[in-house]
């Protein structure tokens, strides 16, 4: 290797392969000579290449990484300098960055994207509570701890600032493809630009390219300056929760964009069920209630509680690192899933009986809705949902149930008292009960595969890696 291409020298470390490079820095994989050859990453910043802005970015990055400690934020272990370089010594992430991860797989399944989003949202919530905005969120700045069951690590805080939703800086920061429109169009922006960037990352992970992906800078500029609503592709099919979040994140007007509080509480982000030390405690509390209801013969209530408990048990299973405790927990989870499936059969038979009994009421309601085309149309969708349900097409049936219920609930609020309102209320109750049952049924199937060791994230990665 020519001397000019050799990595810099740093006492106590052996610098090896180059991991990446930017305008003023190069990152190397390195080994600490002591401490059992600990593996780290070292960002080597050439002093010669630093202008005033670069110095400010570097100082910002060091200041923030020194003070923030979070499982999903890259850890700064130390920083040193000599006459030629400033060295940032960080934890090493063997999985590379999210950009490469997406590129090698083209698109990611929604469930994998949700796991990644939870981790990113967790880091952003931590930063938001400290009034820190990243301002350069993009897949290249999100690292993966490893390829097998990776954890995301938010990195590269060179553009970060201490700011809130009221602040309005003037300087243009970040990467255009992931940059919120207000950063370009008005130059006045606040912390909400990070939410737009999350939307772009989410879009790219699900659809394989960013919404403003362009062949030239002029085309990119045109898309950024446009007032057109961001259209979501119809394929791959997304859950209603995922689609709703994307649409709320990718609002060009920051005042119409989802707020941080709403984002952290959103059903698709679901921070409540993110793997953590608390999830096992919550799961245990719920399963105790489920067993009590089960013993009392309250099957429907017991099924609901078992399902709620499993929503915490599965992330608790992923969080547990001790092999023996994990296996014991998995055994218990399998028992609870088996009991939930038994209860499903009991509840389903009575549930379906109610559904079929509701047919005559539904037909009568249709007759009474001849003068209300919108109500009649929603009832037709409900009938289609029941037909799909009878065919065993749970996913399609659930979509149709939710579609019809959205309309019927609006109709109910506007309906005058009388026989039609009574029938409509009864129909909604029946459809809602069946929709909730199907949701729980689909979740139980997912939990079963996860609890049996087919851990969603690592399984997907293994399948993807086998194609390379």
UniProtKB/Swiss-Prot annotation:
GO molecular function: ATP binding; protein serine kinase activity; protein serine/threonine kinase activity
Enzyme class: transferase
Annotated protein name in UniProt: Serine/threonine-protein kinase ULK3
Domain of life: Eukaryota
UniProt entry keywords in alphabetical sequence: ATP-binding, Autophagy, Cytoplasm, Kinase, Nucleotide-binding, Repeat, Serine/threonine-protein kinase, Transferase
Binding site for ATP: 19-27, 43
Domain Protein kinase: 13-269
Entry EC number(s): 2.7.11.1
GO cellular component terms listed in the entry, alphabetical order: autophagosome; cytoplasm; cytosol; phagophore assembly site; phagophore assembly site membrane
Listed SUPFAM superfamilies: MIT domain, Protein kinase-like (PK-like)
Subcellular localization: Cytoplasm
Entries under Gene3D superfamilies matching the protein: Phosphorylase Kinase, domain 1 (3.30.200.20), Phosphotransferase system, lactose/cellobiose-type IIA subunit (1.20.58.80), Transferase(Phosphotransferase) domain 1 (1.10.510.10)
Coiled-coil regions listed in the entry: none
Function: Serine/threonine protein kinase that acts as a regulator of Sonic hedgehog (SHH) signaling and autophagy.
Active site per UniProt: 136
Organism: Xenopus laevis
Annotated family: Belongs to the protein kinase superfamily. Ser/Thr protein kinase family. APG1/unc-51/ULK1 subfamily.
Domain MIT: 279-347, 374-442
GO biological process: autophagosome assembly; mitophagy; negative regulation of smoothened signaling pathway; piecemeal microautophagy of the nucleus; positive regulation of smoothened signaling pathway; protein autophosphorylation; regulation of autophagy; response to starvation
Catalytic reaction equation(s): L-seryl-[protein] + ATP = O-phospho-L-seryl-[protein] + ADP + H(+); L-threonyl-[protein] + ATP = O-phospho-L-threonyl-[protein] + ADP + H(+)
Taxonomic classification: Eukaryota, Metazoa, Chordata, Craniata, Vertebrata
């Amino acid at each position: 290797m020519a001397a000019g291409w050799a990595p810099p020298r740093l006492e106590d470390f052996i610098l090896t392969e180059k991991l990446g490079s930017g305008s003023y820095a190069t990152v190397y994989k390195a080994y600490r000579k002591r401490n059992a050859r600990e593996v780290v990453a070292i960002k080597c910043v050439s002093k010669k290449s630093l202008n005033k802005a670069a110095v400010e970015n570097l100082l910002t990055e060091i200041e923030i990484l020194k003070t923030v400690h979070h499982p999903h934020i890259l850890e700064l272990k130390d920083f040193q300098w000599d006459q030629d370089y400033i060295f940032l010594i960080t934890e090493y992430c063997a999985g590379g960055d999210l950009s490469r991860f997406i590129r090698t797989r083209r698109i990611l399944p929604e469930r994998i994207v949700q796991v990644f989003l939870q981790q990113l949202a967790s880091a952003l919530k931590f930063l938001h509570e400290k009034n820190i905005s990243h301002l350069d969120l993009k897949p290249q700045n999100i690292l993966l701890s490893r390829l097998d069951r990776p954890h995301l690590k938010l990195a590269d805080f060179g553009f970060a600032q201490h700011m809130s939703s009221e602040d309005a800086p003037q300087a243009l920061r970040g990467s255009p493809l992931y940059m919120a429109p207000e950063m370009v169009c008005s130059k006045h922006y606040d912390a909400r630009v990070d939410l737009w960037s999350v939307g772009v990352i989410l879009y790219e992970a699900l659809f394989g390219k960013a919404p403003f992906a362009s062949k030239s800078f002029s085309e990119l500029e045109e898309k950024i300056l446009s007032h057109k609503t961001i259209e979501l592709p119809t394929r791959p099919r997304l859950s209603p929760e995922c689609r709703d979040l994307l649409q709320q994140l990718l609002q060009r007007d920051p005042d119409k964009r989802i707020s941080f509080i709403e984002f952290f509480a959103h059903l698709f982000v679901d921070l409540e069920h993110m793997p953590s030390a608390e999830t096992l405690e919550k799961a245990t509390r719920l399963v105790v209630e489920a067993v009590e209801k089960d013993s009392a013969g309250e099957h429907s209530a017991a099924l609901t509680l078992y399902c709620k408990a499993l929503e915490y048990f599965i992330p608790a299973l992923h969080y547990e690192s001790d092999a023996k405790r994990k296996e014991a927990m998995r055994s218990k989870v399998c028992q609870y899933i088996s009991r939930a499936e038994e209860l499903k059969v009991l509840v389903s038979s009575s549930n379906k009986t109610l559904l079929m009994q509701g047919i005559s009421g539904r037909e009568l309601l249709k007759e009474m809705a001849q003068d209300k085309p919108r109500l009649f149309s929603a009832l037709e969708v409900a009938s289609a949902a029941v037909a799909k349900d009878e065919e065993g097409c749970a996913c399609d049936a659930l979509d149709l149930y939710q579609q019809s219920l959205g309309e019927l609930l609006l109709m109910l609020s506007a309906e005058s008292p009388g026989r039609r309102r009574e029938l409509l209320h009864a129909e909604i109750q029946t459809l809602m009960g069946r929709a909730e049952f199907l949701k729980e049924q689909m979740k139980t199937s997912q939990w079963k595969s996860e609890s049996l060791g087919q851990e969603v994230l690592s399984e997907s990665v293994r399948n993807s890696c086998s194609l390379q």
